[in-house]
C-alpha cells in the first residue's frame, strides 16, 4: 500500500509551484501595474464589443455575429490566465492545485484552438460578403453561422481534451516547479520524468494540423477576396473591403505568429524564460488589442458606439 501511495503521489502531486515571470520584487510590481490595466482593457473592451453588437440592431449580421463571439472568446481567454497571474505577482510563493492546473490547461488550450478555427470561419464570411454581397445574408444563414461556431468549439474542445489528458497521465517526480506563470504544455513536459515523445509528437501534429488547416482556409478566402477587390468598379467598395479584411488579417497575424513560435518547435529549442514574455503577449496583449483593431477601422462599429454614447449620456440628442 505504501509503495502504491508513493507511486500515485509521484504521478499526481497535490499541487504545483508556479515560478512566475521573474523573482525580482520590483519587476513583479512593475508587471502587475502594467498587466492590470491591459487585462481590464481586454475584459471590458471585449465584453463591451459583444454587448454593443447585441444592443445595436444594425450590427445583427453574420459578420458581427462572429465578431461578438470572438470578443467573448477573448474575454474568457484572458480571464483563464490573467486574474491568477496578477494575484501571483504579489505573492511570495505561487501554487496551483493539480486539478486546477489541469482545468486551466484544458480551458486555455480549448479557447486558443477554438479562436483559430473561428478566425478561419470569419475569413470565409468575409469572402462571401465581398464576393456575393446581394446574397450574403442568404448564403451565411443563421444555421450555417451556428454550425461554423459549433464546429470551432468542438475542434477546440477535442484538441484540448487530448493534450490535457495525455499531459496529466505523465509522472511528475522530477520536480513540481513549473517554470511559467500558468499551466502551459511545454513547461509541464519539461518537468516530467516520463517519456514525453508522444506528447511532443501530438502537440506538433495537432497544433500543426489546426494551424495549417485554418491558415490555408484563411489564405484561400483572402485569395478570392483579393481577386474580387481587383475587379470592383467602386472605389468606396474596394476601400471598405480592404479595411475590413485588413483588420481581420492583423488579428490573424498576431495570433498565429505567437502560437507558431510557442508550439510548433521541438522541445530542444524551448527557451522557457523567453516563452514567458511571448505567453504574456498572446494571453493578455492580443485579446486587449482585438477590440481596437476591429473598431477603429470600422465605420459601423464607430457609429454604433457614438449613438450608444449619445443615448446614455445625452438622452435628448440620442432621441432626435
Swiss-Prot record:
MF GO annotations: G protein-coupled receptor activity; odorant binding; olfactory receptor activity
Cystines in this chain: 101-193
Keywords associated with the record: Cell membrane, Disulfide bond, G-protein coupled receptor, Glycoprotein, Membrane, Olfaction, Receptor, Sensory transduction, Transducer, Transmembrane, Transmembrane helix
GO cellular component, one term: plasma membrane
Compartments it resides in: Cell membrane
Major localization class: membrane
Domain of life: Eukaryota
Transmembrane segments: 30-50, 59-79, 104-124, 144-164, 201-221, 242-262, 276-296
Extracellular topological intervals: 1-29, 80-103, 165-200, 263-275
Membrane topology: Multi-pass membrane protein
Cytoplasmic face residues: 51-58, 125-143, 222-241, 297-320
Known glycosylation sites: 5
PANTHER family: OLFACTORY RECEPTOR
Family membership: Belongs to the G-protein coupled receptor 1 family.
Function summary: Odorant receptor.
Protein name: Olfactory receptor 5C1
Gene: OR5C1
Amino acid at each position: 500500500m505504501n509503495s502504491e501511495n508513493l507511486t500515485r503521489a509521484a504521478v499526481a502531486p497535490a499541487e504545483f509551484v508556479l515560478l512566475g515571470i521573474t523573482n525580482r520584487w520590483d519587476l513583479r510590481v512593475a508587471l502587475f501595474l502594467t498587466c492590470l490595466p491591459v487585462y481590464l482593457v481586454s475584459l471590458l473592451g471585449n465584453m463591451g464589443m459583444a454587448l454593443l453588437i447585441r444592443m445595436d440592431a444594425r450590427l445583427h449580421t453574420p459578420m458581427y455575429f462572429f465578431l461578438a463571439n470572438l470578443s467573448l472568446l477573448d474575454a474568457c481567454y484572458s480571464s483563464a490566465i490573467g486574474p491568477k497571474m496578477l494575484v501571483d505577482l504579489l505573492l511570495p510563493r505561487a501554487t496551483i492545485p493539480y486539478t486546477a492546473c489541469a482545468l486551466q490547461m484544458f480551458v486555455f488550450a480549448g479557447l486558443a484552438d477554438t479562436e483559430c478555427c473561428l478566425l478561419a470561419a470569419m475569413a470565409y464570411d468575409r469572402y462571401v460578403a465581398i464576393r456575393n454581397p446581394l446574397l450574403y445574408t442568404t448564403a451565411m444563414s443563421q444555421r450555417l453561422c451556428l454550425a461554423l461556431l459549433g464546429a470551432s468549439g468542438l475542434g477546440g474542445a477535442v484538441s484540448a481534451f487530448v493534450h490535457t489528458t495525455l499531459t496529466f497521465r505523465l509522472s511528475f517526480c522530477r520536480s513540481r516547479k513549473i517554470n511559467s506563470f500558468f499551466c502551459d504544455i511545454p513547461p509541464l513536459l519539461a518537468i516530467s520524468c516520463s517519456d514525453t515523445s508522444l506528447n511532443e509528437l501530438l502537440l506538433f501534429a495537432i497544433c500543426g494540423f489546426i494551424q495549417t488547416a485554418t491558415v490555408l482556409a484563411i489564405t484561400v478566402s483572402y485569395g478570392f477576396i483579393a481577386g474580387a477587390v481587383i475587379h470592383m468598379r467602386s472605389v468606396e467598395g474596394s476601400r471598405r473591403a480592404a479595411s475590413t479584411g485588413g483588420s481581420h488579417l492583423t488579428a490573424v497575424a498576431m495570433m498565429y505568429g505567437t502560437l507558431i513560435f510557442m508550439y510548433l518547435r521541438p522541445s530542444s529549442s524551448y527557451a522557457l524564460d523567453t516563452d514567458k514574455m511571448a505567453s504574456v503577449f498572446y494571453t493578455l496583449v492580443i485579446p486587449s488589442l482585438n477590440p481596437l483593431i476591429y473598431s477603429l477601422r470600422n465605420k459601423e462599429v464607430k457609429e454604433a458606439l457614438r449613438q450608444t454614447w449619445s443615448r446614455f449620456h445625452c438622452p435628448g440628442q440620442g432621441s432626435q
